[in-house]
Amino acid sequence: MIRHYRCIYRAVLLLALLALPGLKGVARAQTDGVPPPPFNGIAHVAIRVHDLGASVAFYQKLGFEQAFDLRRNDVPYESFIKINDNQFLELYPTSEHDPNVGFLHLCFEGVDLNAIHDNYVTRGLTPTPVRKAGAGNLLFTLAGPDQPSGPQNIEYTQYMPGSLHSNDAGKHLGPDRVADKLIAVALAMKDTAVARDFYINQLLFKPIAHDPMDLHMPGESGQEVEIVPAASLGTKARLTLESENLGRSARLLHKEGIAATKNGETLTITDPDGNILLLEHR
């Protein structure tokens, strides 16, 4: 059912977009000049949860182990859930200062972070300076289009030797993961047309044929973002993960008592805070 309504929405939106002025130059904007510095793919998605321990336990039932966490006074304030050596979920607990659960940010992994940063600056964007973050990797951020909670916080990282992520390579890769790759992230936007224009003409993402709001990131990862109306998702996260064997994934979920809805070639799971996980075989 989710796929059915998404297809209807995209078809209607495609007709509307084709009627807008200026879109004839979109394809040309993708090929003019030097290609943008490539991304390796999605590095992580950050989500705030109401009960960190319960969320960690839920994702462990999906086969995703906690690689490490960050603590203050021996109390965890960030948990890193491992999908594969290059992709993680970052879970943050609610607090008195930050009481709202849901999607926080999306982070892209760059091949050369300084090259991406400098490319953005030359095109008039205003990323923060590249710095070394707490886990030991390079990082910069950029403000994006308006989401339900405010301007999107877009993160960019480059894994560095000796970082917590690099030191965990080959570890915490559970044999019973229900999926092994994060391939798409939905971004709820207040104005989908403005957000689409920003990602295509500012960040140089490429529109996917017949899916006007699905956009491939620069590089050869094939991973994508999906621009969706804020009313359809609110502050929830919606992630699409790739499973090599959906039948096996369904059996693993059943074994752990995790409810899943099957719709064609998609399994839909909801986490304790209502965030949506789509398992697909592509």
Question: Each predicted region: which residue ranges?
Answer:
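Short hydrophobic/aromatic beta-strand micro-patches
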Residues: 48, 107-109, 186-188, 240-244
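Conserved short beta-strand elements that form part of the metal-binding/catalytic scaffold
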Residues: 65-100, 149-162, 204-238, 243, ...
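Vicinal oxygen chelate
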Residues: 30-35, 118-181, 187, 216, ...
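Eukaryotic phosphotyrosine signaling hubs
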Residues: 42-44, 101-105, 182, 234-239
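Core segments of cupin and vicinal oxygen chelate
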Residues: 37-39, 46-88, 122, 130, ...
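Bacterial N-terminal signal peptides that target proteins for export
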Residues: 2-13
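Bacterial N-terminal signal peptides
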Residues: 11-24
